């Protein structure tokens, strides 16, 4: 370990060596000179001595004593009633005694006797905190000051170093030149001494050369001096610039704080100078502006006189400040009289602020007053009218006021406001009426940006892709069972009621290749689903049951396939049944223009059985053969393009869409656009629910991450960035909304009479929530078909997803019934529906929903009134009773007659009166009913012309409930 001397320790402690030696001797450490070595034990003894000397040993002693004194006093105080009461007041006083050091004890006692403050612990802590803050502030200020001083010293040192370096370089150059000259002189003398016979001319040349070199050395020294002066000049210039910048900032601050000055034009300045010249030699004293201070005027010198006096007869200038050709210029602060405010052009020239096209009669500035002006023609503008435009925008395009457009619309018989939206046809009529040329505008369509993406897909290299096969046919003909056998899975058992209510998309890997199947519903309500399936498919498998034959949905499937232009492969199912008749099926299909190959047509017919598997291989072989003929190809290494087969809203996952990729490759993370929905693919699942990273052509996948539920059948495109997708989606939403709004406004007047005639029509409001969009479309379509002239179905709202509280609130406002198709209401919605008495009905089979709605509509129909003859009565004798009228004595020939029954009077088998019985008696007693074979007396209300031989037909009207 390195030894430490007394001098080194004194240097570390910033003390003198002699003082440290004295302290060491006082501590009992014998050291005589600063060079003596100090050990660690010596340092420890010195430290103990210093602690004892400065009182640190007494730190543990108690230095502060707190004394609390309690004083009680009484005061007398009057209360609200005027009585005087004695109130005891207790005051607590706290004193803190602090034990100080001995030298300061007397001073502390004197201060305590003078002030005797009461200081508590909080006050002490606050004061200590304040002292600490002040110390930190002082330390921070000292550090900043020290840093500035160090920076200035460093800058000065650098400047001195540069100057010294320049001087050293100059000196070195001079010394080098002198040394070289001296060496050459010595060499010359040595050469002269060595050879005395050298010519004198050589010596003179050497001398001249030495002189030249001496001059060069002097020149180098001068250049070094000039460089040093240049550095110094640059430093001076930098200092001056800094001072100038500071002065400018100071001037700007003074200017900002100074009162504002009035800027005047040259015309005003000339007028004031003329007035000043007129007042010279008089006793008039110029009035100083109100806002100007005397010191400011004294400091600022007056402006110089103008270079030339104004011409004779020239105007004095506009006192109010004209807007002349020259810009504003700063005026001095000399006191000048302000101009009088006058009416008219005081300047008389063209620069006055009141000068215009209709100047005064003494005005001479307008040289073109009598010049020829060509007549103005109406400007015919070419107005580009978009699909929808507001009245204000249309007026702006024609450069007219909106009021003019509104007047023109009123002339055309339509009341509009400035913000009302007009459709394209109406707007073009208005433009033509106002004398302009209307052109249907081509919108700044963001969808035009999609052309490049589609072109990129078209230019990509195409590869062979699997065929997309759609299975179509009538309900219960075995489509799903056939596909189930091919897939080796149980799908039909999972569908409610054993019927397919969704489009199922699957791809199957067979020994002969990959095939993608689309299973479509066969029920008549799912027409839109079958149309979408035919649109996305390459080949259609038409399933016809051998025991049932061609049915309505079979014909519809044939029509869809022909409209899509895709080949058909007929699969005759259920051939294993005893009552199967494939030949009858062929004959019926021939009637529908589906000709089998054995009859000379081009449609293969394959008898199959989904139970035994008979004909399945032959069916797949025919499908792949058709695919080879079609030569199906699609680009793979390109942005994906596809079709939304089905879409739904999941409570946890959000909008979900089943997409069939038609070309390109869809990857997780791609930005997709589907109609008015857009988003980034967050997750992608195959038909088995397993995650998939990508999907090539003809592969169906389920994607998540869209902004909303897309419409089934929408085209799906992959775009390079989300901004473009959002822009196109919002454009589509706005376009559809504007067009719909404009059409609704145009159709209001046309529908008014129709709505008035429908005032007596009853309506059944419904809110429909389904699991997928295809089912929702089918259910809405089926229910709307139930509407009649008397009762119609009103679909208030139809959407995908569970039943929420907002649906219940909507049902409460519209008095609607909520139908949930494969969906359920959450707890909040159920409670709210129960409180408001809203009927929520759940279904999972479309037949049941349609039947119950049909029954409800039947109950809303007004009952049918039917007449039923109950009896026939013959008049045998007529009695005329005073105050009663004619009374007929009758015999009941058939049926019975009741009191107050409806009757028709028949005379010669012709109805002459229809009315109601007034009374019915047997003998003298009133009776309720008289049956066949008995006599009775009766009178008819408001009819006295009863004759013998008349017949009375008794009937009653019954109401019968009607059904749809």
Swiss-Prot record:
Residues 303-313 have a biased composition (Pro residues). Signal peptide: none annotated. This is Translation initiation factor IF-2. Residues 105-119, 288-302 have a biased composition (Low complexity). Its main location: cytoplasm. Residues 464-633 form the tr-type G domain. CDD domains: IF2_eIF5B, IF2_mtIF2_II, mtIF2_IVc. The keyword RNA-binding does not apply. One of the essential components for the initiation of protein synthesis. Protects formylmethionyl-tRNA from spontaneous hydrolysis and promotes its binding to the 30S ribosomal subunits. Also involved in the hydrolysis of GTP during the formation of the 70S ribosomal complex. Residues 573-576 are annotated as: G4. GTP binds at residues 473-480, 519-523, 573-576. GO terms for molecular function: GTP binding; GTPase activity; guanosine tetraphosphate binding; translation initiation factor activity. The keyword Disulfide bond does not apply.
């Amino acid at each position: 370990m390195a030894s430490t001397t007394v001098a080194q320790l004194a240097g570390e402690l910033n003390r003198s060596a002699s003082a440290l030696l004295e302290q060491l001797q006082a501590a009992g450490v014998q050291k005589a000179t600063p060079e003596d070595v100090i050990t660690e034990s010596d340092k420890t003894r010195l430290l103990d001595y210093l602690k004892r000397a400065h009182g640190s040993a007494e730190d543990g002693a108690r230095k502060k004593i707190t004394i609390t004194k309690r004083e009680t006093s009484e005061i007398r105080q009057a209360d609200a009633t005027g009585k005087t009461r004695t109130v005891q007041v207790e005051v607590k006083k706290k004193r803190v005694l602090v034990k100080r050091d001995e030298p300061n004890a007397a001073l502390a006692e004197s201060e305590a006797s003078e002030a005797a403050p009461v200081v508590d612990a909080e006050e002490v802590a606050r004061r200590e905190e304040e002292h600490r803050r002040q110390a930190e502030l002082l330390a921070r200020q000292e550090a900043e000051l020290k840093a500035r001083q160090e920076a200035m010293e460093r800058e000065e040192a650098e400047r001195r170093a540069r100057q010294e370096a320049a001087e050293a370089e100059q000196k070195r150059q001079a010394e080098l030149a002198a040394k070289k000259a001296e060496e050459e002189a010595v060499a010359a003398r040595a050469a002269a001494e060595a050879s005395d016979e050298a010519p004198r001319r050589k010596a003179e040349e050497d001398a001249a050369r030495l002189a030249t070199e001496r001059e060069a050395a002097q020149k180098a020294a001068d250049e070094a001096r000039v460089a040093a002066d240049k550095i110094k000049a640059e430093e001076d210039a930098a200092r001056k610039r800094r001072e100038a910048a500071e002065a400018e900032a100071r001037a700007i601050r003074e200017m900002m704080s100074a009162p504002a000055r009035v800027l005047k034009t040259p015309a005003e300045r000339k007028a004031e100078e003329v007035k000043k010249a007129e007042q010279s030699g008089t006793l008039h004293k110029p009035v100083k502006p109100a806002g100007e201070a005397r010191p400011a005027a004294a400091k600022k010198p007056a402006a110089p006189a103008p270079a030339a006096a104004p011409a004779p007869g020239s105007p004095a200038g506009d006192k109010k400040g004209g807007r002349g050709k020259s810009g504003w210029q700063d005026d001095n602060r000399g006191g000048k009289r302000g101009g009088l405010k006058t009416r008219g052009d005081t300047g008389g020239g063209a620069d006055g602020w009141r000068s215009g096209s209709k100047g005064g009669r003494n005005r001479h500035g307008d040289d073109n007053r009598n010049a020829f002006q060509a007549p103005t023609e109406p400007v015919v503008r070419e107005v580009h009218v978009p699909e929808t435009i507001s009245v204000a925008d249309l007026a702006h395009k024609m450069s007219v006021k909106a009021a003019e457009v509104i007047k023109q619309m009123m002339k055309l018989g339509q009341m509009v406001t400035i913000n009302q939206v007009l459709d394209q046809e109406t707007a073009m009529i208005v433009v033509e009426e106002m004398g302009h040329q209307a052109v249907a505008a081509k919108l700044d369509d963001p969808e035009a940006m999609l052309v490049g993406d589609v072109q990129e897909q078209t230019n990509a290299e195409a590869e062979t892709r699997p065929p997309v096969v759609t299975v179509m046919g009538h309900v219960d003909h075995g489509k799903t069972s056939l596909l189930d056998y091919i897939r080796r899975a149980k799908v039909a058992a999972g569908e409610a009621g054993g019927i397919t209510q969704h489009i199922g998309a699957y791809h199957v890997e067979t020994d002969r290749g990959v095939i993608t199947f689309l299973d479509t519903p066969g029920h008549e309500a799912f027409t839109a689903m079958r149309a979408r399936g035919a649109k996305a498919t390459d080949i259609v498998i038409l399933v016809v049951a051998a025991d049932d034959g061609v049915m309505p949905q079979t014909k519809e499937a044939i029509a869809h396939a022909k409209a899509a232009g895709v080949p058909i492969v007929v699969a005759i199912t259920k051939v294993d049944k005893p009552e199967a008749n494939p030949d009858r099926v062929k004959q019926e299909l021939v009637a529908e223009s589906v000709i089998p190959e054995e009859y000379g047509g081009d449609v293969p017919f394959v008898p199959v059985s989904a139970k035994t598997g008979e004909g399945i291989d032959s069916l797949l072989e025919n499908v792949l053969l058709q695919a080879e003929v079609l030569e199906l190809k699609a680009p793979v290494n390109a942005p994906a393009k596809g079709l939304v087969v089905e879409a739904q809203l999941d409570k946890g996952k959000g909008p979900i869409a089943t997409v069939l990729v038609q070309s390109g490759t869809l990857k997780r993370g791609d930005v997709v656009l589907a109609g008015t929905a857009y988003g980034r693919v967050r997750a992608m699942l195959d038909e088995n629910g397993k995650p998939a990273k990508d999907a090539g052509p003809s592969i169906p996948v389920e994607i998540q991450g869209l902004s909303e539920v897309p419409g089934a059948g929408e085209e799906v495109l992959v775009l390079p960035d989300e901004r473009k997708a959002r822009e196109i989606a919002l454009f589509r939403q706005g376009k559809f909304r504007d067009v719909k709004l404009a059409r609704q406004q145009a159709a209001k007047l046309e529908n008014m009479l129709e709505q008035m005639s429908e005032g007596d029509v009853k309506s059944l409001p419904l809110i429909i929530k389904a699991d997928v969009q295809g089912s929702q479309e089918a259910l809405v379509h089926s229910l709307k078909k139930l509407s009649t002239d008397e009762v119609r179905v009103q679909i208030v709202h139809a959407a995908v997803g569970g039943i929420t509280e907002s649906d219940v609130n909507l049902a409460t406002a519209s008095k609607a019934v909520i139908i949930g198709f494969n969906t359920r209401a959450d707890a909040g919605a159920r409670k709210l529906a129960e409180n408001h008495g809203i009927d929520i009905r759940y279904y999972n089979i479309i037949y049941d929903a349609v039947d119950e709605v049909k029954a409800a509509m039947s109950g809303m129909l007004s009952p049918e009134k039917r007449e039923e003859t109950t009896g026939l009565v013959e008049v045998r004798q007529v009695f005329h009773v005073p105050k009663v009228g004619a009374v007929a004595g009758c015999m009941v020939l058939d049926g019975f007659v009741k009191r107050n029954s409806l009757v028709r009077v028949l005379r010669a088998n012709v109805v002459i009166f229809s009315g109601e019985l007034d009374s019915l008696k047997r003998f003298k007693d009133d009776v309720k009913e008289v049956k066949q074979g008995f006599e009775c007396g009766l009178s008819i209300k408001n009819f006295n012309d009863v004759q013998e031989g008349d017949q009375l037909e008794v009937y009653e009207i019954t109401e019968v409930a009607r059904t749809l």
